[in-house]
Amino acid sequence: MLNKQKDSHSKNDLNAKDRDLFKQLFINRTDVYACQVANGDYSQVKSPLTDEILFGDQTVGTYNLDRNSYVINACLDFDIDKKIHETKDSMSADEWDQWIQTVKQHTKSCFAYLQSLDIPCYPEFSGYKGYHIWFFLDKPMPAADVRRWIQHIRALLPAMPKGLDLELFPKQDKISADGYGNFVKFPLQVNRKS
């Protein structure tokens, strides 16, 4: 499940039933999304997120909070620390692969621990330098409640190895009526930097 195989699954290969499930699990806002541009950065797009965009060749992300500050999922985002990543060009391929293996093994350990607690969760290679572990809610819940829960989950996890970073999504308890909060990249995307 945590294999870094870029061609093992593709969002373009999903059938209609799987596409509907994907949207149900991951899309909380359809009026805005983030799109990765050529240099690897993301740009906010304030237009409807259509199936053509979501399941096309673009790399896109979702904003967790809806306009009422409710969420439908949570995510642990394990990455190689930015300071280490900034030195990637001076590393050998083997050194970089060791960092990828470190984040992979730590994510596997956390996933196994969460499974031992009977906490349903789903890992994925997020592309480039890390992994996500997703949690799906039975119904939309206030982001503040989900943030408290995900912070509690983080406190239960094995200690982070030096050189790794962990982000929690959602990152906000609430947003203003015209706010967006942070986004997280959808699964099955091709990271333009990798």
Where are the regions a protein language model picked out?
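Catalytic "initiation/cleavage/transfer" segments centered on a nucleophilic residue
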Residues: 161-194
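A common structural junction motif
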Residues: 151-161
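Signature for HUH/AEP ssDNA processing cores
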Residues: 2-131, 136-152
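Acidic/proline-rich low-complexity IDRs
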Residues: 1, 13, 159, 163-167
